[in-house]
Amino acid sequence: MKNGLKASVVALFFLLAASSASAATNSVDTVTYESNSDFFDGQVLQVGYTSNFATDKINVYLSESKIESETGAVADEPITFDVSHQNTYAKYPTQDTGLESITGWDAVKKTVSSKQELWDWTTTNCVDTNDAGTFTVDGYGTTDVDARANRWFDTWTGQYKYTIYCWQRNDYYGAVADIGSPDEVFRTEWRLQAGDKNPQTAVITNGDGGTGVTSNLGRYAKVSWEGSLSTGENPPLVDDEYALHSNDYEGGWRVISESRYSSYQSFVQNNADDLLGEWGAGLTTESHIESEMNGKAEEAASEFTESPLSDSEILDSSFQNGAFKLDMERSLMYPEFSVYVDAGENGYATISKPVGKPEIVSTSGAEFGELGQGTISVEAENVGDSEGSFSARTDSCGEYFSGNSLQDTQRVSPGGTASFDFRVTFTSTSMTQSEFSDQCEVVVEDTGSGNEVSASVSVTATQEDECTEGDETKKEKQVNGETVDVIMSCTNGLKLEEDEVCSADEEARYIDDDVQYECRDKDSPPGGGGGDPWTIPGLGWQLDTPFGGMEKALSGNAGALTWAQLLLSFIGFLAGFALVGVKLGKMVDGLATEFIPLSDAVVRLGIGLVGGGMAFMAVYQLVTNPLGFLLTVVGLLLTGYLYLKGTTPDINL
């Protein structure tokens, strides 16, 4: 047995036969080596054939050299296909459509003495010949049978009597069925042989199958009907034929004329009752009306010799599944078959082809964070005897991971290698930061042979904290060997990112719900403040500035605490303005007006604004500290109490 992968053989035949020519065809048009079939493991040898339109027999011989020259595959023995002994016919099924049976007729007469006897005898012994007619007996209702009755007086008995005239059925010609449209049926004998091995044979008919149906051709091959059968002639249509069923006929069936049957039915329905009336009136005889009715029945049941089905065979004699068989004059035309031959390691035919064989020699995993992506790689070596065409794909990845499997095919010489890279992404619904590790399976395949190998590659991804956009928090990290605070900000609702890194002398301090965190000197007074701190030049002292609180107050976003801080600071401003502007203003009035040409009021206003501003800043520094705020409020309440106590006059009653 040759080295390499074993193959399955597919023989695809287009049997194109016209008229009844009997020339045999023994060549093929195409031989290709393709992918696996659905029936046997291994590669597929496809043999395609197109007829010269003048054959009803196929006798194809595929030598070892023919197979190798067309495909590069090596065969240990020749393969032959024979298709012969065609038999084609049209099958006409019968159909029960509720048609009335054909029978003989007896005209009967009966004399009774009462209306009750008339009713009883008529409904029991007479038949209906006209579906639309009814027979009425006064005082006893109606019946759907057809009958005539004469009432007369019997002088011998002195009573009125009734004479009844009606029809009864006698001879049974048979049940009538419709004939359906014909189905073409063919029968061919197949024979396949590899070298001197036992031949594989089968009889293929489209009556047993149809498009997409597969039959066994012995143990090691299959024949599939793939096309539509035609002989180049249309089976005769049945436009004036019915089928009559009775055990008296050969095969249980007889072909009759539809028009004769319709004439019989029309005569019975339209004339049977009138014939009874003529007989009862004495205008004709019993034998005459029976001859009229039975003549129509015999004519309807007679064989329709003018029909093309008069020479047909009976395929099924039962009434439920009856069928006629009509042989066709022409041979098959345009049937299409596929033959699949097992040529694997333990198969029927021995065929092999050198191919590439991949082997994964190295892999490279990936580590990345959420919203990012990583790259995994595999390197495959061709350890086969022939050039290979390698492709790779990510077959599957663990939970939360997905891989991009689109890859270009690479041709690899024996002993050569090819590298394949795959982009891997990570998505998780977890809300907390954690690390996920899993694997992706990568498959490398030689496209020519179907040989494939796989390897598992490690992937690791870090799940970031999910957050509310705009929120800030603080964390610690090492910078130059020192632990510092880092202000983290949520900018996109998915992850926290570094917003500001504090120095070693600073700390991330929470200010309020709007400002949130700021880097402040560790030695600065505690408290939030309302904006960026101001550093006093030369001293390095940091002061809380009120501008942030004022901005919030003006925009309507200030809370109760901010309003209280600004109000207390404004009281400090008024106190500073009054004390400094009045007291200190008097001291500098003369000095200022001596050197500066300004009025005393303007000087006092300027000095008061400076003093008030300094008082405002001093109070603001105090009240932005929680303890200072509390002491300020308590001090104001105590001062107010003492002021009221000292200024309120005593009232003596």
Curated annotation (Swiss-Prot):
Its membrane topology: Multi-pass membrane protein
Extracellular side: 24-559
GO molecular function: metal ion binding
InterPro entries per record: Fsx1 (IPR049902)
Keyword Aminoacyl-tRNA synthetase attached: no
Fusion loop: annotated segments: 154-159
Any one Gene Ontology BP term: plasma membrane fusion
Segments forming a coiled coil: none
Disulfide bridge map: 126-166, 397-440, 467-490, 502-519
Residue ranges annotated as Cytoplasmic topological domain: 581-600, 643-653
Cited function: Exhibits fusogenic activity. Mediates cell-cell fusion in mammalian cells (bilateral fusion).
Domain notes: The extracellular N-terminus has 4 domains; the first 3 are structurally similar to fusogens from plants, C.elegans and viruses, while the fourth domain is unique to archaea. Domains I and II are discontinuous. The fusion loop in domain II is stabilized by a Ca(2+) ion so that it protrudes from the molecule.
Oligomeric and partner information: Homotrimer stabilized by interdomain contacts and numerous Ca(2+) and Na(+) ions.
Protein name, UniProt field: Fusexin 1
Organism in which the protein naturally occurs: Haloferax sp. (strain Q22)
Lineage: Archaea, Methanobacteriati, Methanobacteriota, Stenosarchaea group, Halobacteria
